[in-house]
Amino acid sequence: MIISAASDYRAAAQRTLPPFLFHYIDGGAYAEYTLRRNVEDLSQVALRQRVLKNMSDLSLETTLFNETLSMPVALAPVGLCGMYARRGEVQAAAAADAKGIPFTLSTVSVCPIEEVAPTIQRPMWFQLYVLRDRGFMRNALERAKAAGCSTLVFTVDMPTPGARYRDAHSGMSGPNAAMRRYWQAVMHPKWAWDVGLNGRPHDLGNISAYLGKPTGLEDYIGWLANNFDPSISWKDLEWIREFWDGPMVIKGILDPEDARDAVRFGADGIVVSNHGGRQLDGVLSSARALPAIADAVKGDIAILADSGIRNGLDVVRMIALGADTVLLGRAYLYALATAGKAGVANLLDLVEKEMKVAMTLTGAKSISEISGDSLVQELGKSLPAALAPMSKGDAA
């Protein structure tokens, strides 16, 4: 098997994983238009090639929330990570730690906070959802703080689960889902042995520790469905500040006014994100949303971005559009499913090499030199031509 890009890991993961797991991470909401646009829009961002610039002292190092990162990349929070490789969160965290970048543990991880945090040298980040059960939220915040987590990533674009039609077809949900998942596991012996048998327990560690009992996949679906809170508002975030005094990042921002609200609230960062196209189909891609948000709050708050990033070139594009750092999600999960820690480590090496090539050929010696000037622009407009709003003729 030849691996030269994240797309190769995706193909390998599809062969390795039972369909219900592959399509759970690979799919999006509704007809998946936003899922596709995340990738397509970003791929159309054109960079300015510059030559004869003496790029011998190129550096990818950057600083975020008083942490030094070897490159402006962090691993995004991904639920059920431990179902994609044996104790998957531990393996992914180890790869990120070795690379010198942050790993973000999801609320709905298989491995609990207390299992992952002691295995790495640098502080990990912790992601928390807006949930009705405030007791759980407080418990999770206290445990994250006790484990030395440095940054809280608070996901706000999930007051209700998205409509993910692919899950019903794949066996993650829908009629006879448990039986369908069982037979899929039987037909994928590599996964069944490595994860199905030797990756136990398969409960959601952070939730189990709070409830005092194991939580399987059906429990996970039911517990989340009953606990997402559509009543959340900015006032609720003030409550969280009572229990968390470290950096707080608001994840799920697509509108400049919401970004300004995050600044007014006193958040330390935002993630420009549409949840990887998994929540509301038809919203802007992150690449389209990012420039206007950067115009509104750049310099007032740290800007992170995710959704659609598949390689190092995409990282450079996102930074040129206005991000300070990006989050990788699906790309690293494909690598994790294929080859565990080694797969994630190799993917991060590929991203680093791709970034160096892009920066060398655009004349940017450092991350701070990647800016809107790195983009090919249309008649002096601040928004790249490929991402400019469609005209009526284009829409037809």
Curated annotation (Swiss-Prot):
Active site positions, chain numbering: H275
Enzyme class: oxidoreductase
Keyword line: Cell inner membrane, Cell membrane, Flavoprotein, FMN, Membrane, Oxidoreductase
Intracellular or extracellular location(s): Cell inner membrane
Residues the record lists as binding substrate: Y24, Y129, R164, R278
Gene3D superfamilies: Aldolase class I
Domain FMN hydroxy acid dehydrogenase: 1-380
Record's bilayer topology term: Peripheral membrane protein
Enzyme Commission code(s) on record: 1.1.-.-
BP term (GO), one: aerobic respiration
Pfam families: FMN_dh
CDD domains for this protein: alpha_hydroxyacid_oxid_FMN
Catalytic activity, reaction form: (S)-lactate + A = pyruvate + AH2
Cofactors demanded by this protein: FMN
Entry-linked SUPFAM superfamilies: FMN-linked oxidoreductases
Disulfide bonding pattern of the chain: none
InterPro entries the UniProt entry points to: Aldolase_TIM, Alpha-hydoxy_acid_DH_FMN, FMN-dep_DH, FMN_HAD, FMN_hydac_DH_AS, LldD
PROSITE patterns the UniProt entry points to: FMN_HYDROXY_ACID_DH_1, FMN_HYDROXY_ACID_DH_2
Similarity comment: family membership: Belongs to the FMN-dependent alpha-hydroxy acid dehydrogenase family.
PANTHER family: L-LACTATE DEHYDROGENASE, S -2-HYDROXY-ACID OXIDASE-RELATED
Name the record gives this protein: L-lactate dehydrogenase
Species per Swiss-Prot/TrEMBL record: Salmonella paratyphi A (strain AKU_12601)
Gene name per UniProt: lldD
